[in-house]
Structure formats: C-alpha cells, structure tokens
Amino acid sequence: IMQGGGPAIRGRTYRIFHKHSVDVVVNELVDWAKEGVAQLGCSPCSLVIGIGRTHYEATAMMIEAQVYGDFNVQSDLEKKITDKVNESHVGALGLGGKTSVLATFLKVGQQRASGVRIVSLSPNCCIEPRIASVEL
C-alpha cells in the first residue's frame, strides 16, 4: 500500500467516557478518523463503526455494520460523522481534497447506564467487501 498502511493497522477499539452526550462520542470518533484517514494509503474510504458494552461486542457491531452497510442509506448520525471528517480536507491518500470519506456505516449495540462506551472504528478502503454478484 502506497503511503504507509492499510485499514488493518489504522483501526482502533477503545473506551470513551462520553459524559452522557452523543457529541462527545462523535467528536472522539472524528478525531480518530481524521488521524486514520490521513495515514491510509488508498482512495476515499468508508468508515465502519461499532459501539457496544465490551471490546468484543463493539468489534462485532463494527463487522455487522460493514456487512450490511449501504452507501445509499445513511442515518443522520452517519452523515454527520462523514461530513465532519470531510471538513478536515485530508483527502484521498492524505494528499488533501474535499472528499476523504464516501460514507460511514454505524451499528450501536445495547448500552448500560455507565458513562463508558467501547467504540471500534475502522477506516476501510472503498473497495472493502460489499455484497455483489455477477451472472455470466
């Protein structure tokens, strides 16, 4: 990969003390995404995010978001994350530009009342596995 690493080493799974505000989680995710996208060696990417109670659950949610993600169907929160990362003008390959992220796929699992969420984020090249078929 051209500029120093692919999605496998740019992801992150960690806890966020959210103070019962979704904006705290979104801002932390955007900071992580900007850093990962700038170092990603591929064209504009898609962000895949899972939020859960444990590292295992957050990662499972992230994988499920990737499997069922649809570029044409984006929630308001997914659009908000995509727009905030694109406002950084990191661009493809970290070379600058208006489009760093094509879409965000987000899946949130059940939560508990504590002030901590485990978040798993992976900036994926836009050619990561998608559901497709070819008939010959």
PLM-predicted stretches and their roles:
Residues 1-136:
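Non-transmembrane, aqueous-exposed alpha-helical and coiled segments at domain scale
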